From Swiss-Prot:
GO terms for molecular function: ATP binding; glutamate-tRNA ligase activity; tRNA binding; zinc ion binding. Coiled coil: none annotated. SUPFAM superfamilies: An anticodon-binding domain of class I aminoacyl-tRNA synthetases, Nucleotidylyl transferase. This is Glutamate--tRNA ligase. It is found in: Cytoplasm. It is an enzyme of class 6 (ligase). Its main location: cytoplasm. GO terms for cellular component: cytosol. A motif ('HIGH' region) lies at residues 9-19.
Length: 473
């Protein structure tokens, strides 16, 4: 049997972390078994579908490297086929037209709830005489078996059993001729020869309904595996209200695709105590038997730790290529400042995302006027400009550019002025980085370069002279 899996998102919003984990598990299962992976867009819900979401799905999958073998297929391209099959089901007696009004359905629901019963359609139109009904809108319902059980082996959860008496006659075709999710899913899984359906546990209740449709149509049913939900730290369903769930936002904020995949694959699956997996290891080691049943807790700090690991593995050049995208987005000319790779060498060590690196080096390319005035008031005095000019002159005279030469320039300056190094080092740190917290001042100056350092100090001197009153100096 050829393994064929599918990822079938509905483009109604951003691509959720949980959705990408589902896609990843389906993709890995196909790759592990030399099978095929299909991308299917379930876009029949016209009122909720967003074109931008379709583009988001495709772009995100590409960025993550989750390449598909077939697709993307769109359900809206098959509306005619769904309608033809629905008519055939009516003709063969496994589906029927339902003329019940919304008012009747609502009243039925209220009555059942008041009786303590589970709300479901009562089959009123199953045997209705159609000859007395003319020009009335209808939906098409599946004739679900009234007796017996639906029993199937979930590849993660084991044997699951459902009473048919608890399943109602679900709608397969709306009054506007648009097919519903469960119906489309069955037809598409059959047409695409899907062998394994891997999806979230929120779909478990859909599975017996789909299995009954498969059986009624006398077509082969795929195997099912339902993965656990992802919860937040309070053990509530992960949602954008309390934690960003949009995968694309994580990528745009400097999370690496390989880090996201590594984190998500471990969110429910394990291989011993190993935490770090490259994509080839995932394809080799992944199996559904090692996927847990329990819900998983999303831990942003764990994701940041993994992302930091992958950042350290990247070359300075590769990081620089990514950082330049942040500059371009802000329309800042990075060619007017220090070489980005030089700054990356000293700032990447403690950075957990590419965005953190960018934020730390941004000021090196901005005008000194954007500095936090509180820092100037805290560390600059009326004599600071004099100290900076002396330091600048000594720096200009250096013949070799090295960390040792920079240290020597500081030593000569503080010896001449007879004060603590902080009086000159902190102002220079703020002039170059815009922050009072940064790596070694010697490393910063060395990475910034001689000409850029002198240029920025002179600009700062002029700015401070022009704004003495404003700065209370």
């Amino acid at each position: 049997m050829t393994v064929r899996t599918r990822f079938a998102p509905s483009p109604t919003g951003e691509l959720h972390l949980g959705s990408i984990r589902t896609a990843l598990y389906s993709w890995l299962f196909a790759r592990k078994n030399n099978g095929e992976f299909i991308l299917r867009i379930e876009d029949t819900d016209e009122e909720r579908i967003k074109k931008i979401s379709i583009n988001n799905i495709i772009e995100t999958m590409k960025l993550l490297g989750l390449n598909w073998d077939h697709g993307p297929y769109f359900q809206t391209k098959k509306l005619e086929k769904y309608n033809i099959i629905a008519k055939e089901m009516i003709y063969s007696g496994i589906a029927y037209k339902c003329y019940c009004s919304k008012n009747r359905i609502n009243n039925l629901r209220i009555m059942q709830i008041n009786k303590g019963e589970k709300p479901k359609y009562d089959g009123f139109c199953r045997n209705i005489e159609e000859k007395n009904i003319k020009n009335k809108r209808f939906v098409v319902r599946f004739s679900n078996p009234k007796n017996g059980y639906v029993i199937f082996n979930d590849l993660i959860r084991g044997t699951l059993k459902f009473k048919n008496s608890e399943l109602d006659d679900l709608i397969i075709l709306r009054s506007n001729k648009i097919p519903t999710y469960n119906f489309c899913s069955v037809i598409d899984d059959h047409d695409m020869n899907i062998s394994h359906v891997i999806r979230g546990e929120d779909h478990i209740n859909n599975t017996p309904r789909q299995i009954n449709i498969f059986k009624a149509l006398k077509i082969k049913c795929p195997k099912y595996a339902h993965i656990s939900m992802i919860l937040d730290k309070d053990r509530k369903k992960l949602s954008k209200k309390n934690q960003s769930t949009d995968v694309m936002k994580y990528i745009k904020n400097g999370f690496l695709p390989e880090a996201l995949l590594n984190y998500l694959v471990r969110l429910g699956w394990s291989y011993g105590n190993q935490e770090i997996f490259n994509i080839d290891e995932m394809k080799k080691l992944f199996n559904l038997k090692s996927v847990g049943k329990s819900s998983c807790i999303f831990d942003i700090n764990k994701l940041l730790w993994i992302n930091q690991y992958y950042i350290q593995k990247l070359s300075d050049y590769d990081i620089s290529s990514q950082i330049k995208k942040f500059f371009n987005k802000k329309e800042i000319d990075f060619n007017q400042g220090p070489k980005i790779e030089n700054l990356i060498k000293i700032f990447k060590k403690k950075s957990r995302t590419l965005k953190e690196i960018f934020n730390q080096i941004l000021f090196f390319y901005e005008d000194f006027s954007k500095v936090n005035f509180d820092l100037i008031k805290k560390y600059f005095t009326i004599d600071t400009n004099v100290h900076l000019k002396i330091f600048c002159k000594k720096l200009e005279k250096t013949s070799l550019w090295s960390v040792e030469e920079i240290k020597n320039t500081f030593f000569c300056t503080i010896k001449e002025l007879n004060f603590n190094i902080k009086k000159i080092a902190m102002p220079i740190r703020i002039i170059l980085s815009g922050s009072e917290h940064s790596p070694s001042i010697y490393s910063i100056i060395y990475s910034c370069g001689k000409l850029q350092t002198i240029k920025k100090i002179k600009i700062a001197i002029k700015f401070i002279n022009d704004n003495k009153k404003k700065l209370n100096l």
